[in-house]
Amino acid sequence: MARNVNCVYLNKEAPGLDFQLYPGDLGKRIFDNISKEAWGLWQQKQTMLINEKKLNMMNLEDRQFLEQQMINFLFEGKQVEIEGYVPPVED
């Protein structure tokens, strides 16, 4: 049976992650408060950030930047701004 969480990003109850995907206290906070759907949305933004900003995950500063963006996106409701990206126009 799926584990439900009260997702702070979606502001509703939704299926939670199957296991802790991120280390440490932040990982526990994500596991307890973020749904699979919200995590999937973050992964899309994360991929775009890494590619567009040419982040190197071996670089501590780049990892710290990405972690702060993740916190802003998942817990503070801030949208990730990616230079040059224009979302598709819906008809």
Swiss-Prot record:
It comes from the Bacteria. Keywords: Iron. One of its GO terms (cellular component) is cytosol. One of its GO terms (molecular function) is iron ion binding. The keyword Iron applies. One of its GO terms (biological process) is cellular response to oxidative stress. It holds the Pfam family Iron_traffic. Disulfide bonds: none annotated. NCBIfam families: PRK05408.1. Belongs to the Fe(2+)-trafficking protein family. Could be a mediator in iron transactions between iron acquisition and iron-requiring processes, such as synthesis and/or repair of Fe-S clusters in biosynthetic enzymes. This is Probable Fe(2+)-trafficking protein.
